[in-house]
């Protein structure tokens, strides 16, 4: 965001040409960030879709280091799982290096919501079913390794 807009209040900012270049959904995320007094300059960029903006905004709201995932190379689904992992203080480095499918990400996210991080025992070559089986083993208190499922 250009410095010229720094001293404008929200009502005046949304009347600028700068704000008009965003879609309505993107504008909503920017407005929500401004209303929460967040640094929207991190995500108020046209290259982010609204869902990516939302994940960055939620991370800022929860005091997460969003610069880890505020990159257009990550889909909004990847950003969501990375954010949730960071919120739990899990090691999410594999998520930054490997590209998991949407279905795989849903299982990883399910584990995060149950305070279980299986990232150290999976990779993106495993099927959805294999990753789900590993998560289920962890839920039962069983420790497993990838070799147990290949």
What is each residue range found by the language model?
Residues 1-150:
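General marker for long, soluble alpha-helical cores
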